[in-house]
Structure formats: C-alpha cells, structure tokens
Amino acid sequence: GPVGLLSSPGSLPPVGGAP
C-alpha cells in the first residue's frame, strides 16, 4: 500500500491496519 499509510507490502513503514 501507500508508504506509511497502510500495512501492505508497499508500505514503509507498514503503519495502519488496512491491507
């Protein structure tokens, strides 16, 4: 997901709870 927004493989860091 978007960086720093969602806990998805594309998020760094994975912040949030949406996949």
Swiss-Prot record:
Q: Where is it found, in Gene Ontology cellular component terms?
A: extracellular region
Task: Please verify whether the record's keywords include Iron.
Answer: no
Can you say where in the cell this protein is located? Secreted
Keywords annotated in UniProt: Antibiotic, Antimicrobial, Fungicide, Secreted
Q: Which GO terms describe its biological process?
A: defense response to fungus; defense response to Gram-negative bacterium; defense response to Gram-positive bacterium; killing of cells of another organism
**Top-level division of the source organism's lineage:** Bacteria
Function, in words: Has antimicrobial activity against P.wickerhamii and against Gram-positive bacteria B.subtilis and B.megaterium as well as Gram-negative bacteria X.campestris and P.solanacearum. The synthetic peptide partially inihibts growth of fungi P.capsici, V.dahliae, F.graminearum and F.omysporum.
Protein name as it appears in the record: Antimicrobial peptide GP-19
